[in-house]
């Protein structure tokens, strides 16, 4: 079997979830959309089922996968429904539903439902993706209450720059939300991962930890709470070939790298088809048999190359950590002008191996 694999530490996942609740004192929806950010939604939900207050996914298809796997906790559909016909399924499977636009509100008013919905009414407090504008929010709230189709309303919004702790935008959004929701009945959900960790004064009855669950910091600098996160995924593979090359020899596509001296080059079974970034630069950190090493040469579809010259004990079968406890995925992503969300979600071909269930 090809040695590339993603090790998933479910005990670390539970630790990170508990940290989110400890930091806020609020109930927490574990965000496991996009197949739990590449970690496997069903297995992550099963690992958290005994303690999670609920889960959040992007769409009904993701919710149905969880229900079919036996997950019975509340599941929030973060984008709501895309067609009015989905309302029947939402009721049948007891999903909670975000309502963020006029046509969704109208569809609920017209629907004949077997029982009332639990709705999360979303305000666009300044991110400008989806949600009712502040001046329209109270009217939408009143229409939902008057419809007779809704059992409970949670009022929510989403911060666009909470990962920038010195940026005033979060306080501006909070002020807009507070003004527009004043006097309206319902619980509040405002805090995403960076707000859970870095904005303790933001009120929330419910929080929505996402990237922090998987042990990746949303911040570019050290933070005392973020530093307590544990990485859930370790991406690793093995050396499958060793080349002894003299100085001046090209390595890989485009001859981007040439040996600087007599070097031992290890070929690792990992490439961009697995989700490792093709544009990783020469010198990118890897760990070889538990010691720091470096990538050299261009990443190809199924393989990449590392410098084994200063690792005399390394050779065929040596373990190479691409990201994980020794190579933080957030720091790695920043080197490529990317974000940890993208790297984690891009893993499609690598099998997962779970521990800590």
From Swiss-Prot:
Residues found modified as N6-carboxylysine: 122
EC number: 5.1.1.1
GO cellular component annotations of the record: cytosol
Swiss-Prot/TrEMBL GO biological process terms: D-alanine biosynthetic process
CDD domains reported in the protein's UniProt record: PLPDE_III_AR_proteobact
Broad EC category: isomerase
Source species, domain of life: Bacteria
Cofactor requirements of the protein: pyridoxal 5'-phosphate
Positions carrying N6-(pyridoxal phosphate)lysine: 33
Family (UniProt): Belongs to the alanine racemase family.
Subunit structure: Homodimer.
Protein name as it appears in the record: Alanine racemase, catabolic
Organism: Pseudomonas aeruginosa (strain ATCC 15692 / DSM 22644 / CIP 104116 / JCM 14847 / LMG 12228 / 1C / PRS 101 / PAO1)
Lineage: Bacteria, Pseudomonadati, Pseudomonadota, Gammaproteobacteria, Pseudomonadales
């Amino acid at each position: 079997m090809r040695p590339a694999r993603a090790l998933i530490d479910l005990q670390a996942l539970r630790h990170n979830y508990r940290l989110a609740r400890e930091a806020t004192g609020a109930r927490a929806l574990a965000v496991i959309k996009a197949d739990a950010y590449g970690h496997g939604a069903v297995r992550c939900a099963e690992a958290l089922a005994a303690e999670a207050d609920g889960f959040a996914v992007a769409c009904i298809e993701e919710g149905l996968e969880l229900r079919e796997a036996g997950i019975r906790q509340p599941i929030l559909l973060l984008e709501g429904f895309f067609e009015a016909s989905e309302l029947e399924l939402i009721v049948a499977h007891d999903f909670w539903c975000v309502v963020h636009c006029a046509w969704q509100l109208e569809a609920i008013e017209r629907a004949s439902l077997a029982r009332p919905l639990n709705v999360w009414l979303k305000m666009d407090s300044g991110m400008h993706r989806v949600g009712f504008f502040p001046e329209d929010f109270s009217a939408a709230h009143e229409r939902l209450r008057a419809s007779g189709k809704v059992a409970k309303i949670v009022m929510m919004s989403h911060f666009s720059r909470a990962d920038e702790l010195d940026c005033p935008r979060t306080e501006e959004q909070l002020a807009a939300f507070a003004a527009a929701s004043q006097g309206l009945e319902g619980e509040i959900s405002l805090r995403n991962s960076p707000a859970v960790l870095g904005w303790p004064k933001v009120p929330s009855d419910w929080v929505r930890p996402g990237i922090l669950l998987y042990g990746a910091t949303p911040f570019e600098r050290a933070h005392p709470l973020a530093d307590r996160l544990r990485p859930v995924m370790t991406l690793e593979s093995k050396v499958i070939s060793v080349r002894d090359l003299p100085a001046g020899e090209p390595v890989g596509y485009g001859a981007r790298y040439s040996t600087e001296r007599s070097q031992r080059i290890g070929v690792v079974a990992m490439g961009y088809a697995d989700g490792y970034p093709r544009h990783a630069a020469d010198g990118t950190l890897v760990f070889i048999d538990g010691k720091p090493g470096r990538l050299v040469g261009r990443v190809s579809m199924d393989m990449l190359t590392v410098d084994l010259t200063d690792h005399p004990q390394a050779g065929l079968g040596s373990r190479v950590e691409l990201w994980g406890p020794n190579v933080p995925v957030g720091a790695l992503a920043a080197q490529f002008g990317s974000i940890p969300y993208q790297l984690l979600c891009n893993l499609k071909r690598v099998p997962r191996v779970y521990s800590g269930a």
